[in-house]
């Protein structure tokens, strides 16, 4: 599954609401069918049945199973065996061993605890891992805190630290980096600012909890027309240059060209000839 090419707008959808599956798939780049926190305990059997009975495109679908070591996870995996889905999201990931147990499935490790944050590099290095995500609210709860954000909406320092840790671990091992959800659905401006920052520092995805957030995220990740035009020009100029060179008043070297290639990739344009 080439999730890197899917796009930046991923959407959680409760797995016990199969009537929402098609709408979610139409709105999002990737749908995350949720068997964990989004489903009440009494509804989990129905959610597992819905996975089998209401299939989506497995190339654009991830299933969030329950945490490792739980009876619910074992039941989730049994249900998944009857589907075409090959990628799972592991919540509260805390070790490489938890990820390796899920092979041969591809795994997006969701880090939501202090132990998971400390072991992020180990988790990212595990062979089944294809992506790394972090979760702010569960993280703060496990730390004994009460709020992940300050009054102005900005993340508190510990949340920012874990966010950066996950991004670095994902990048170090060539995994997708997924930014946490923005819980305030009505705060479009806050989501836009957060998604722009995520794209600027190297996240591949901002995960959403409502279809209305998807276009905001896509717009935030897409470079402006001016930046795309610059990227095309500088890459064209680089073909006749060796090493670093001056271009439009700026010194250009390999990292600058990588930034330009990333812009075009996010816009869906090829960068090789």
Swiss-Prot record:
Substrate binds at residues 64, 112. GO terms for biological process: oxaloacetate metabolic process. GO terms for molecular function: lyase activity; magnesium ion binding. Its EC number is 4.1.-.-. The lineage of its organism: Bacteria, Bacillati, Actinomycetota, Actinomycetes, Mycobacteriales. Its cofactor is Mg(2+). It comes from the Bacteria. Homotrimer. It comes from Mycobacterium tuberculosis (strain ATCC 25618 / H37Rv). Pfam families: HpcH_HpaI. The keyword Iron-sulfur does not apply. May play a role in fatty acid biosynthesis. The gene is citE. It is an enzyme of class 4 (lyase). Binds 1 Mg(2+) ion per subunit. This is Citrate lyase subunit beta-like protein. Mg(2+) binds at residues 112, 138. Belongs to the HpcH/HpaI aldolase family. Citrate lyase beta subunit-like subfamily. Keywords: Lyase, Magnesium, Metal-binding.
